[in-house]
């Protein structure tokens, strides 16, 4: 009896163990199949991943190359602009130098020859000639204090003398001084009114033909040449100067 019970227990235990073993083997097989499936999928994905990585690498490389190209372009443009600006500045400076270039003679006035400079002696001679004359053509002034006038500009008939003398000096008509005839006549009439001061001048007038009053015969007075009147005035001046020189001696 005990043997029969023992056999039943062994039989049940064997069945249970066999079931468990079979079930474990099935689980292991299923697990192995899943693992193999995952491995296959992973192996299949490797080319895809490599392709993606390759494309991404090329894209990154292309971006880097494009950045380098852009930087190179900008650098070239900036360098070209700088060179262009420098060239333009040099050309502008060169043009300015040409415009502002000073002739050698002006830059070095000392290099001029002595013949280009007016000699001091000639200047002194001109100054002395003007000092010895009553009229200075450069300034257009008359020196009424000049000794060559013999003091006639300051006598009783000084104003008449100044008018006649200035009229003749500044005359631009032909013959010279033709419009000054009346002024010279007025001067001579003044001389006659003051014989004590103008004896010599009146003596020269007496040697010549007596003058006709301008108011009485204008035609005769106008016929008298201006040169003759100028000569008379010159004689008066010279005689007056000689008289003063003799008195001072």
UniProtKB/Swiss-Prot annotation:
Residues 56-249 are mitochondrial intermembrane. Residues 154-198 form the CHCH domain. Residues 1-22 form a transit peptide. Residues 95-127, 232-249 have a biased composition (Basic and acidic residues). Its cofactor is Cu(2+); Zn(2+). Disulfide bonds join 146-148, 157-190, 167-180. InterPro entries: CHCH, CHCHD4. One of its GO terms (biological process) is protein import into mitochondrial intermembrane space. The chain crosses the membrane at residues 37-55. It is a single-pass type II membrane protein. A motif (Cx9C motif 2) lies at residues 180-190. Monomer. This is Mitochondrial intermembrane space import and assembly protein 40.
